[in-house]
């Protein structure tokens, strides 16, 4: 069973002058095991995406280290799949060619990569869209292709940076439910960033709340709303339950504090 360990990680962005350095993260510790669905919440600029980029190997910490199993993360790798807010698919390739693209780069033979891509497209409900071009798909379907592409390389971990931020509400709920089914079937590690408290509560088996810069993990919650959904399939009932609503209000209060008390309508519907 794989484990990702973030150990006392800090990141400082140097400024033009020494007094202009920006401390993005400070002393972050986090453990994620196979089967964990960890969701990160926090106000804009708190370092959520920076932490994900460090896990992905897109950048290196100023202090501390990140280990995946016994391997120190020093760059991107096939053991971590990334799904971005924008799908990052190749528009000149069709759905199945996009899905198997990572395996092709690794030199996997065509029959094997086609089989893996076919299975993962079926997993996200796109078994009938192999030959469709990316620009013919809706935003939700494009994100499904992105998820299938990440899964096809069989990573130990999926890193997802607000993958549903640009989707309409109905599509967003559909993809949320799909993600939980994928999580249940694959038992992979998930690290998911969102600005929606409702989405975080529904998806996560663990929720971390990060402070404004310098980003630190200030609160951790163990959750089971996702398992309740997988047992009964009624997302609306879960999201309207008293304990779900109470938890939502508590976390909104932590993140936004006085702003929430002022009645800002954007926050009240977060």
Swiss-Prot record:
Membrane-topology annotation of the record: Peripheral membrane protein
E.C. designation(s): 7.6.2.7
Keyword Cell inner membrane (UniProt): yes
Keywords: ATP-binding, Cell inner membrane, Cell membrane, Membrane, Nucleotide-binding, Plasmid, Translocase, Transport
Localisation per UniProt entry: Cell inner membrane
KW Cell inner membrane (keyword) present: yes
PANTHER family, alphabetized: TAURINE IMPORT ATP-BINDING PROTEIN TAUB, TAURINE IMPORT ATP-BINDING PROTEIN-RELATED
Assembly and interaction partners: The complex is composed of two ATP-binding proteins (TauB), two transmembrane proteins (TauC) and a solute-binding protein (TauA).
Similarity annotation: Belongs to the ABC transporter superfamily. Taurine importer (TC 3.A.1.17.1) family.
Protein name from the UniProt record: Taurine import ATP-binding protein TauB
Annotated organism of origin: Rhizobium meliloti (strain 1021) (Ensifer meliloti)
């Amino acid at each position: 069973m794989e484990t990702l360990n973030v150990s006392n990680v800090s990141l400082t962005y140097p400024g033009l002058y020494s007094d202009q350095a920006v401390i993005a993260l400070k002393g972050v510790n986090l453990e994620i095991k196979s089967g964990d669905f960890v969701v990160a919440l926090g106000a804009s600029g708190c370092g959520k995406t920076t932490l994900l980029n460090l896990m992905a190997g897109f950048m290196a910490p100023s202090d501390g280290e990140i280990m995946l199993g016994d391997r120190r993360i020093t760059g991107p790798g096939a053991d971590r799949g990334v799904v971005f807010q924008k799908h990052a698919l190749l528009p000149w390739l069709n759905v199945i060619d996009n899905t198997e693209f990572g395996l092709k780069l690794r030199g996997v033979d065509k029959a094997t990569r086609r089989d893996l891509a076919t299975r993962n497209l079926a997993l996200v409900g796109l078994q009938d869209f192999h030959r469709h071009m990316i620009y013919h798909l809706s935003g939700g379907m494009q994100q499904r292709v992105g998820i299938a592409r990440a899964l096809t390389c069989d990573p130990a971990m999926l890193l997802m940076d607000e993958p549903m931020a640009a989707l309409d509400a109905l599509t967003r709920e559909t993809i949320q439910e799909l993600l939980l089914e994928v999580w249940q079937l694959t038992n992979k590690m998930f690290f998911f960033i969102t600005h929606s408290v409702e989405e975080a509560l529904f998806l996560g088996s663990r929720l971390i709340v990060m402070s404004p810069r310098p980003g630190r993990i200030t609160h951790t919650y163990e959750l089971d709303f996702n398992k309740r959904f997988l047992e009964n399939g009624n997302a609306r009932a879960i999201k309207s339950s008293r304990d779900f609503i109470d938890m939502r209000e508590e976390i909104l209060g932590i993140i936004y504090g006085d702003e929430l008390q002022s009645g800002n309508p954007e926050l009240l519907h977060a």
